[in-house]
């Protein structure tokens, strides 16, 4: 998905009624940098897949592109004061803000699943223009794991000579595969796995009709990564887990049932 003026069919980035939380280290770092005038134009968000890196980057974009001050916060513990009814933040949530570009692998005609070099080149042009609403221009690449070396090299010039009032959030689950020159020009913030309770809360908010038992199983199996928990739920992998546990705790192992489960 790409979000920018003129891009077709933008999709909502996140639901402000169910905002991400639990990563105050990142949100506090962004706030401190902006308020202290020490803004790193490139931010590299690392951590396990599904832990919420993209969601936190989108939330930071909503905060950066807000148009009024003094609103109530999405989540009290994050310190990021934004209101989903703020004009700028609302456009970010809906995926329509002209000063936000989100780059993800294209779905059509993209067997490799990679972010294409042309997408990175469009990013260069996007950040080179003045903000449409007079504030910042923000871009999110989700994720750098799908950017090849040519794309990373094209991105490097942006990181070396960033235009004024631009922020670039790079998402990476495998940052060690990135060129050292890219990593060295970014402020690196690790987004760790959530604790069990925070993970359960996020999964429960996303699946309000599910039982508490299933929510607990999904949170435990995901190891603190809510995105992974939702993927497990979609594939019904947690059902296999519960069936296997039930078989293995029987006084006598039902080898036939176990063999059927493994098929």
Description of each model-found segment:
Residues 1-63, 68-85, 90-91, 164-166, ...:
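Charged, glycine-rich active-site and insertion segments that engage polyanionic ligands
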Residues 108-117, 144, 188:
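Flexible beta-alpha connector loops of hexameric P-loop NTPases
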Residues 143-147, 175:
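Conserved Walker B
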